[in-house]
């Protein structure tokens, strides 16, 4: 029976015109640390109606509506009721060939943002063009045909055959392209949202669909001009959730169907069996026409409330305008990357249907669930700049995740990647230094201690340094123990049978690995810091001693004095002389001596024959024979030097030259840790520029980057799965951390770092959450300002400055400052008094 129709004028007054309130975006405590059984299983049911669900901590308060958090459903929204009833709203787009695009939308993303990580506002554009043929592909083929002397005869023949085919396909796709703009804003207490879909081309058909997100029990129906649905709670079977979708105008057609397949058949011109599994509204739009709607989830049936289109638009406009006002944002050549990072990580925020919270998807086309390898550790550090709530949920999710099949059964970071434990330890520690939150430390610490204590099984000769695990004879996978796949460092190690160990079936090898031992030391150092915070002094002493032992051994055995590099070495004493950015990893782990760090930076990092240049850093040194050895190289080609043929890899793939965000982030942190402020700023500026080049050009944040400007890895790539890869944001976060950061290294973990000696121009970043305060920074050639909670607390004039160990007290502040010339500094403490002094160029400790 149809519900009573509420007059349009009452709609927004009932559901709330404001964006999502703080009560809805906070972390619920649920029932303390109680774990919920995987949703959708028998274990997820149990509580009776009226009982509080056994939600895990941390998670989102129920009920909630979140746009775009079901994997790759960028145009849709997930609705979750109090008892964990679940509903999916999707916006589908029909292609000219009659194919319905309704989920797994990564290939069809056209424009991203603006958006927020809490779902208060989200905007995307999707298109029927999957960009498998792009102008760069066609240009590359023309280049091959025009210069047959530079390519093999078979490559020229392949290009000659494919160019007309791909040109025809491209022209057809462009002529038939349909693009829509989708906007959402959460309303009221966060259980509802309003949305709008705008056709950017004529003859556009879109579908508004209500269904179950993961095939769970639910029923749907038509009700007047709208759609309704109901579903039992997965945590509380006796509690039923209800959803209503209310459009502002009648659809051209509508129906309820027995399955998604039936619905798809019906909206694409066929017939579909009626039923209650899915309901859909179909609209046929001309260019510029917009459909608006509202949707809400509740514990009881919802009255039909039809919104006014102009009220929906007003709410969307207000929420969109608030994106920069209440979330990470910035300006300037580097600072503007803050908005891109916010949008990218908001896009890749996903809901874990088993552990009932949000996390950051690592990549693989935006899907694949939670990944507990090293990738997601970078995602946690980056997400912490965007949203404390998201970062804490993400890293908690990692440490509650079971081991992948056929692996050592450790909960948390996966053991087949020996750097996943160290990197997640570093990520968890940075959540503590950023927010002062011990909850994730307490959860992570036992698993990380176990991970650390298993690592000696990779010490083949029992000398205290680790050797590379054997990962098989496939060249492309021999570096998989560190996620380095085909890195040439690992091409020639030898297998040695392992005795005993954790149950990991891999054997040992004869290669003492600089990178692996740097991670080993990082884990020991981080565990020592965690142990001090958690009141475990004996553990702190043990792990600090372990870090010192690795530092001594690595400097004794893996420093090549003639080359001035930390290099891996075989057990027979011969050196592995392949030079990659892992030579800098001892700086990241605090192992390098100050003099050796200076040699690494001045003689190697800044050498354009090795690593320096407009693009940094290649995954193999440019003067190493292994550089770009993964395929043919065409030196005379201006823009397609590394292009081979359509659909195939290129010379820098994968770790044979391409620039990788985790490598850059590791090198940057090491350089910054050792106090090379000028170099760190220049490095961060280059990393950020590479990220922004891809973002500005295609709205992508790719898995890896070209090692040289204007080349073809990403522009000519066909595989769209790597275009929205979360760790890409680590490139831009270097620039943002250069402006303001926590202090993850020595000294007071509550202290701040801010300012820069060498980022270009004047840059700002705002709405950065650190230790319970909201910060903004402006840093330019002759003025640096730090604002806390809306009040200026630091100002330096006359020079560029980089500030470390900044601690603001009620009656003053203390900090270390590095200035590129004489400057005046002022501190405005909590007592309201201004305190200032002059500082010379160089380094000065200041107490005011």
State what each model feature region is.
Residues 25-47:
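C-terminal region of N-terminal signal peptides and the immediate post-cleavage residues
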Residues 307-311, 315, 333-341, 387-399, ...:
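Extended, well-ordered alpha-helical scaffold segments
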Residues 2, 40-330, 721-726, 741-848:
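Terminal accessory carbohydrate-recognition/targeting modules of carbohydrate-active enzymes
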Residues 2-4, 10-30:
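N-terminal export signals
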Residues 328-368, 393-412, 464-512, 552-659, ...:
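Extended glycan-interaction surfaces of carbohydrate-active proteins
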